[in-house]
């Protein structure tokens, strides 16, 4: 059970890395660091909540 939840967390994090890298490539603004942090927060926080919910089941 624990291993399964760890597997799902690692697969989610790899998807997040792909999304974040595509956002950073597409962003040419001077404040792209701030935009990248916002995007990372939007992607990572729901992912962590989902992983926590999966781990509790």
Swiss-Prot record:
Subcellular location: Membrane
Primary location group: membrane
Gene Ontology CC: membrane
TM helices/strands, residue ranges: 34-54
Topology class, membrane: Single-pass membrane protein
Keywords: Membrane, Transmembrane, Transmembrane helix
Record protein name field: Uncharacterized transmembrane protein DDB_G0286193
Annotated source species: Dictyostelium discoideum (Social amoeba)
């Amino acid at each position: 059970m624990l291993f399964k939840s760890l597997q799902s967390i690692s697969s989610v994090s790899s998807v997040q890395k792909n999304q974040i890298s595509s956002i950073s490539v597409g962003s040419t603004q001077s404040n792209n660091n701030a935009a990248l942090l916002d995007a990372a927060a939007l992607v990572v926080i729901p992912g962590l909540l989902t992983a926590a919910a999966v781990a509790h089941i």
